[in-house]
Amino acid sequence: MILSQLLEYDNIYIQPHDNPDPDALASAFGLYVYFTSYEGKNVKIVYSGRSKIQKSNLVLMIEECEIPIEYVEKDTDFGDALLITVDCQHGEGNVSNLTASKIAIIDHHQGTGVGDYREVAPYLGSCSTLIWSLMMKEGFFIDDNTKLGTAFYYGLMTDTGNFMEVSHPLDRDMIDSVKYSKSLVKYFTNSNISLPE
């Protein structure tokens, strides 16, 4: 699957898994940046689940990177639209059952989720790397977007234990390529230690 295949849809909802982590947020944000660069697209990042985002590092990441995510009720039906699940697979246990007329799955975990479009790369350390790679294949470079670069970097960092589990060249390429804020990454990381949850 390539991202430009999904440009036929004007109403696009991007859903990370319930209780999203930094990689899920960064992945959703990357798709949001890509699709909103095209005129006439109504794009929203939505999530559901038992609770709203509360962890300090995630709240700070959303604020500092300006990730426009909103909570919706379980079983929301978006009607004639495309729903893209990121860092998870539609129909599996870690993601609420939101619906739309078409479903796309973009993930770096093996799974059995069913969708009309599917891109799964279990060899990568993060879904952020997969989204970054899909954007690069479209010639969509994010060199000047430090907020997205920071989100991607932090997403991979947290999903790979501070890069200890990075083994694929694409993960390394993303680390070397994106422009990110070292101070923000440190701020997010330290917030888990210093701020009460």
Tell where the protein language model's regions lie, with residue ranges.
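A structured phosphate/pyrophosphate-recognition subdomain
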Residues: 2-19, 29-36, 113-197
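Active-site cofactor/cluster-binding pocket
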Residues: 60-117
